[in-house]
């Protein structure tokens, strides 16, 4: 016989547009000496351990299955007239995790008056999970578990769906229950992998890095040394040791909620120019919600900064964030931050800031991604309006892994404008408010063959340039460094 396989394309004549073309019907219809199937409504089909059978690779299923020279053409009406064949096909599709088969057979099976409600509910859950409707799948699985608590196959799917939807506490409970079941070794190994992943989600995450940088113009002195009768500071070059260390922990709550706490310290040390040493340390804590597609939260923070080894300022603030996967390849990242800075050296420099950032990331494949972003930053100083400005920025990044060579690169470009409320010292002579234009570029290169204890060094070259109608604020800065980062 010949049975066509249907997976979204029409291979049959127009008069048979609704024909079901599934190989699994062959065994259901023509199996020799097949014993009569018992009533599916009384069968404990959800107590099987075979729920995690690997899905059928649809690309390897032949379009036609030949046997005895016959051709079987079955449409929905024919199946409805043969409830036993329809039930066999539905059951076979479910236990083999044949998503394509479930998608075709389920709508017809639901029209059958003598249907197995549990089988239909299970199929609806599998299909919803495959289509990314995880909350709907969880609802179906929970209804099934309530009816049949001793169903490890369903519980495994429920636990996986909860894990996927970031309901970590509920997922951990289900996986703990599964661990007590007498499951096959392969499934028990899968349960342990999930439990390990859940522990890692809530474990402390520590990251750090350092680099040695050769910098040009570390004091950000103007490009000109003379302007009229004024003499500006000379540009200072130097070597810096940059460092960063941070730790963060997440505590999972019910229904996808979580709390976080963390701290970090970063800065740079100039061995030959200690007056330029700069360090920032901060702590933060917050609450958030995450599921399969989005992650949103609110965090409060406190930061302290030292400059030249002396206390310089501290900042208190809050940050909102919302990240969402729009599609499997497109992701949006949004955040808003407000903070109040207190300058411990000069009270007239106290200010508040507001920052809003939006990014769009496109993951072309596992080896390439593109990112574009828009930023707005506003700083206000009640005591000195000359420091007040708005900054409008654009960002672009391109990450690439170059084929099988092992070489990877990351290119970053940024441009921004600063509009000040009042003229600067030199722009005031022209009767103009201060206006700055910024340009930032950097290129990072690394090779996966070069690593030591899990650390792959990155070579980075960067250039920063500011052009201004106030000559004192025009400068260029170049850096070259090798960076070492580690997360554990």
Swiss-Prot record:
<dbReference type="GO" id="GO:0009279">
    <property type="term" value="C:cell outer membrane"/>
</dbReference>
<feature type="transmembrane region" description="Beta stranded">
    <location>
        <begin position="393"/>
        <end position="402"/>
    </location>
</feature>
<keyword id="KW-0843">Virulence</keyword>
<keyword id="KW-1134">Transmembrane beta strand</keyword>
<feature type="transmembrane region" description="Beta stranded">
    <location>
        <begin position="368"/>
        <end position="377"/>
    </location>
</feature>
<feature type="repeat" description="TPR 1">
    <location>
        <begin position="118"/>
        <end position="151"/>
    </location>
</feature>
<feature type="signal peptide">
    <location>
        <begin position="1"/>
        <end position="31"/>
    </location>
</feature>
<comment type="similarity">
    <text>Belongs to the Slam family.</text>
</comment>
<feature type="region of interest" description="C-terminal probable beta barrel, partially restores export of lipoproteins">
    <location>
        <begin position="203"/>
        <end position="488"/>
    </location>
</feature>
<feature type="repeat" description="TPR 2">
    <location>
        <begin position="171"/>
        <end position="204"/>
    </location>
</feature>
<dbReference type="InterPro" id="IPR007655">
    <property type="entry name" value="Slam_C_b-barrel"/>
</dbReference>
<feature type="transmembrane region" description="Beta stranded">
    <location>
        <begin position="316"/>
        <end position="325"/>
    </location>
</feature>
<feature type="region of interest" description="N-terminal domain">
    <location>
        <begin position="32"/>
        <end position="202"/>
    </location>
</feature>
<keyword id="KW-0802">TPR repeat</keyword>
<comment type="function">
    <text>Required for correct export to the cell surface of some cell outer membrane lipoproteins both in Neisseria and heterologously in E.coli.</text>
</comment>
<keyword id="KW-0732">Signal</keyword>
<keyword id="KW-0812">Transmembrane</keyword>
<feature type="transmembrane region" description="Beta stranded">
    <location>
        <begin position="257"/>
        <end position="267"/>
    </location>
</feature>
<comment type="subunit">
    <text>Interacts with the C-terminal domain of surface lipoprotein TbpB.</text>
</comment>
<feature type="transmembrane region" description="Beta stranded">
    <location>
        <begin position="478"/>
        <end position="488"/>
    </location>
</feature>
<feature type="transmembrane region" description="Beta stranded">
    <location>
        <begin position="294"/>
        <end position="304"/>
    </location>
</feature>
<feature type="transmembrane region" description="Beta stranded">
    <location>
        <begin position="280"/>
        <end position="291"/>
    </location>
</feature>
<feature type="transmembrane region" description="Beta stranded">
    <location>
        <begin position="407"/>
        <end position="417"/>
    </location>
</feature>
<protein>
    <recommendedName>
        <fullName>Surface lipoprotein assembly modifier 1</fullName>
    </recommendedName>
</protein>
<feature type="transmembrane region" description="Beta stranded">
    <location>
        <begin position="204"/>
        <end position="214"/>
    </location>
</feature>
<feature type="transmembrane region" description="Beta stranded">
    <location>
        <begin position="455"/>
        <end position="464"/>
    </location>
</feature>
<feature type="transmembrane region" description="Beta stranded">
    <location>
        <begin position="241"/>
        <end position="252"/>
    </location>
</feature>
<feature type="transmembrane region" description="Beta stranded">
    <location>
        <begin position="439"/>
        <end position="448"/>
    </location>
</feature>
<feature type="transmembrane region" description="Beta stranded">
    <location>
        <begin position="330"/>
        <end position="340"/>
    </location>
</feature>
<keyword id="KW-0998">Cell outer membrane</keyword>
<feature type="transmembrane region" description="Beta stranded">
    <location>
        <begin position="354"/>
        <end position="364"/>
    </location>
</feature>
<dbReference type="Pfam" id="PF24575">
    <property type="entry name" value="TPR_Slam"/>
</dbReference>
<dbReference type="InterPro" id="IPR011990">
    <property type="entry name" value="TPR-like_helical_dom_sf"/>
</dbReference>
<keyword id="KW-0472">Membrane</keyword>
<dbReference type="Pfam" id="PF04575">
    <property type="entry name" value="SlipAM"/>
</dbReference>
<keyword id="KW-0677">Repeat</keyword>
């Amino acid at each position: 016989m010949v049975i066509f396989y249907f997976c979204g394309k029409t291979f049959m004549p127009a008069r048979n547009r609704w024909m079901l073309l599934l190989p699994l019907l062959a065994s259901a219809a023509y199996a020799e000496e097949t014993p009569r199937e018992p009533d599916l409504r009384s069968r404990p089909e959800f107590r099987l351990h075979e729920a995690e059978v690997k899905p059928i690779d649809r690309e390897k299923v032949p379009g036609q299955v030949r046997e005895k020279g016959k051709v079987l053409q079955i449409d929905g009406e024919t199946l409805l007239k043969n409830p036993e064949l329809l039930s066999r096909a539905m059951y076979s599709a479910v236990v083999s995790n044949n998503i394509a088969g479930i998608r075709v057979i389920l709508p017809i099976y639901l029209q059958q008056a003598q249907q197995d409600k549990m089988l239909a509910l299970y199929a609806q859950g599998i299909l919803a999970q495959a289509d990314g409707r995880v909350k709907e799948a969880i609802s179906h699985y929970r209804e099934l578990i309530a009816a049949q608590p001793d169903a490890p196959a369903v519980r495994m799917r429920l636990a996986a769906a909860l894990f996927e939807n970031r309901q970590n506490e509920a997922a951990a409970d289900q996986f703990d229950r599964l661990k007590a079941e007498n499951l096959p070794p392969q499934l028990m190994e899968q349960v342990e992998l999930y439990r390990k992943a859940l522990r890692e989600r809530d474990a402390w995450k520590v990251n750090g890095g350092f680099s040695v940088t050769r910098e040009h113009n570390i004091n950000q002195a103007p490009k000109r040394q003379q302007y009229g009768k004024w003499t500006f500071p000379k540009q200072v070059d130097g070597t810096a040791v940059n460092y960063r260390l941070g730790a963060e922990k997440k505590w999972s709550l019910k229904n996808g909620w979580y709390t976080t706490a963390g701290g970090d310290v970063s800065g740079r040390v100039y061995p030959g120019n200690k007056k330029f040493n700069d360090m920032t340390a901060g702590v933060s804590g917050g609450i958030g919600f995450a599921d399969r597609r989005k992650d949103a939260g609110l965090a409060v923070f406190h930061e302290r900064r030292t400059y030249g080894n002396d206390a310089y300022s501290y900042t208190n603030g809050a940050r909102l964030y919302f990240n969402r996967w729009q599609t499997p390849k497109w992701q949006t990242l949004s955040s808003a931050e407000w903070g109040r800075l207190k300058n411990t050296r000069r009270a007239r420099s106290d200010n508040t800031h507001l920052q809003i950032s939006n990014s769009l990331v496109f993951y072309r494949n596992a080896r390439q991604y593109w990112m574009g972003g828009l930023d707005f930053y506003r700083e206000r100083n009640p005591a000195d309006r000359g420091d007040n400005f708005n900054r409008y920025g654009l960002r672009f990044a391109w990450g690439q892994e170059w084929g099988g060579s092992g070489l990877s690169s990351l290119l970053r470009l940024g441009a921004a404008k600063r509009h000040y409320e009042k003229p600067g010292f030199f722009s005031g002579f022209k009767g103009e408010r201060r206006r700055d234009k910024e340009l930032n570029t950097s290129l990072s290169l690394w090779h996966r063959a070069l690593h030591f204890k899990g650390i792959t060094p990155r070579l980075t070259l960067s250039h920063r340039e500011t052009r201004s109608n106030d000559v004192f604020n025009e400068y260029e800065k170049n850096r070259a460094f090798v960076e070492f980062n580690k997360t554990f």
